[in-house]
Amino acid sequence: ICFSCYIWNISFVRELLPDLKKILPQVEFWAGGPEVSYDAVEFLKKNPAFFGVMVGEGEETFHELAGYYIERKPETLSEIRGVAFRDENKDRNIVHTGWRELMDLSKVPFAYSNLTEFKNRIIYYESSRGCPFSCSYCLSSIDKKLRFRDTEMVKKELQFFIDNKVPQVKFVDRTFNCKHDHAMAIWKYINEHDNGVTNFHFEISADLLREEELQEMSTMRPGLIQLEIGVQSTNPDTIKAIHRTMDFEKLK
């Protein structure tokens, strides 16, 4: 059983696992996500109910881990990159196999081929990973490499949502408009293919918006898009202290 661990659920996961392990002593529990990836060994030392941790991006690691448990391919956990686990053959000493190389975002499988189970739910979608900023309090600042899903692939997948009249598609890109060409192409596409129903939600940095983008937005149907604007602080001293950059005049 695997748990994705984020800032909003990590305390509950830690509290739940000791009792869950008592109920299911034969089950090996795994954790993954940003709250456990960067101190995986220490996390396992402090949380004995967990057997292992998947570190970093999980798509390929989870696939191989499932292969290990289902058909023992690979034959040992040590053959899987991106995991830390208790080695049963070494007095349960913790083994860390190291981080995987960051994957090509265009190779991540499309998760919504069948929308039946997602009917009337928010669809979460990702067209980029990484963040251009280095806010000192945020784990996103650790990943310095910005990666983008192929724009034509994104358009094709968004058309699937549009054709199915999904109520809302929420982009989880950390700063959607950090690359102008990428953002502009997607905004232009959803504007041209508006079905009158689907709403698209984006997290953006307002001071990065260009006149071309604002002009495109001015032609959109009211409610076609929602913009969640990240303003970490309006105090210049605070912005400097957290190593963030922001054009306050443009933001105003």
Ranges and model annotations:
Residues 56, 85, 98-102, 110, ...:
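Active-site donor-binding loop signature of nucleotide-sugar glycosyltransferases
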Residues 106-252:
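Radical SAM [4Fe-4S] cluster-binding motif and immediate context
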Residues 6-10, 35-37, 58-61, 101-104, ...:
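Short, solvent-exposed loop/turn segments at secondary-structure junctions
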